[in-house]
């Protein structure tokens, strides 16, 4: 995992964390958005959009039905997803003419979502961070029945894999999975999913011992990418979600005007914006190497020579 430090040697009054091109979505309430990079990118690829009034409403609660739409937009693309229809009511409270019926039906059939024991889905209800992370992990290829997402302790299994996949990266404060997800948090988690590596499973094997047949399910393994899209997100030979489903989206490593590490996002030739990477730790005074190790979560076996300062600002 890439880690860097920002050692600020003087107060910088005009330091900007983001430079946005004219092509980026300009919501009327953009100053209230905490996760601007995520919202800008997810808006640019048309996974999520604002309201007719021109605002985004970042703290508005995400509904279960809207979450299903986001997942479908991510997997199928917004054009194909918008044409989804439900041949039959997927749940008794989701008739075929419901606004989100097609999205909900698709997610149900692919095993990404499940309803309640009484046969309802409650599309207008909010959903927790755990529930949305579960949907995003399903989009990445994780199988709910194999990974324990349907067991009594499903939230623990979801939290572990979601955090390992980096789906909560950049979240301000600790991840609270029982709290209802708002719109900008949903954008952040979905944006991190675009950068996450997809998984797949080998075919199940069957072993017969006497009169007993045992079916063995393989573990999830990272999906390889040997095609031209490798490098759109990470040049690592692995298939990141966006490299499979958003092949026109590219994140280019660069630096901002203060020489800090940054990422320039673009769709085809249209630039979305350039966003400064979030430092793993920032210091404004003398610091001991032991404190740096602790802040970066590094073990004692790692040499101090491997800790690099990628942003050193002199004013």
Predicted regions: what they are:
Residues 41-48:
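Mature N-terminal segment immediately following signal peptide/propeptide cleavage
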Residues 191:
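Conserved redox-cofactor binding core of oxidoreductases
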Residues 313-315:
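Conserved small/polar residues in nucleotide/adenosyl-binding loops
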Residues 308-311:
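Transmembrane and membrane-interface helices of multi-pass
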């Amino acid at each position: 995992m890439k880690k860097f430090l920002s050692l600020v040697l003087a107060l910088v009054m005009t330091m900007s964390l983001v430079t946005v091109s004219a092509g980026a979505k300009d919501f009327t309430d953009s100053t209230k958005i905490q996760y601007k990079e995520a919202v800008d990118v997810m808006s640019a690829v048309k996974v999520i959009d604002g309201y007719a009034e021109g605002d985004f409403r970042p703290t508005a609660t995400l509904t279960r039905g809207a979450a299903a739409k986001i997942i479908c937009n991510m997997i199928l693309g917004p054009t194909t997803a918008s044409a989804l229809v439900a041949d039959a009511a997927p749940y008794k409270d989701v008739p075929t003419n419901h606004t989100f019926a097609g999205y909900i039906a698709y997610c149900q059939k692919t095993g990404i979502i499940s309803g309640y024991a009484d046969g309802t889905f409650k599309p207008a209800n909010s959903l927790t961070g755990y529930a949305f992370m579960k949907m995003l992990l399903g989009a990445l290829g994780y199988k709910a029945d194999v990974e324990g997402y349907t067991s009594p302790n499903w939230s623990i299994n979801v939290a572990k894999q979601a955090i390992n996949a980096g789906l909560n990266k950049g979240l301000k404060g600790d991840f609270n999975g029982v709290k209802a997800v708002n719109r900008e948090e949903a954008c952040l988690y979905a944006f991190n999913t675009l950068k996450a590596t997809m998984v797949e499973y080998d075919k199940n094997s069957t072993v017969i011992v006497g009169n007993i047949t045992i079916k063995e399910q393989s573990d999830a393994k990272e999906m390889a990418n040997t095609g031209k899209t490798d490098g759109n997100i990470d040049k690592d030979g692995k298939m990141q979600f966006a490299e499979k489903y958003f092949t026109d989206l590219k994140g280019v490593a660069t630096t901002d005007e203060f020489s800090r590490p940054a990422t320039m996002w673009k769709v085809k030739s249209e630039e979305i914006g350039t966003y400064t990477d979030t430092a793993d730790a920032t210091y404004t005074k003398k610091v001991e190497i032991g404190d740096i190790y602790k802040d970066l979560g590094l073990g004692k076996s790692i040499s101090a020579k491997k800790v690099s300062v990628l942003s050193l600002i002199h004013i």
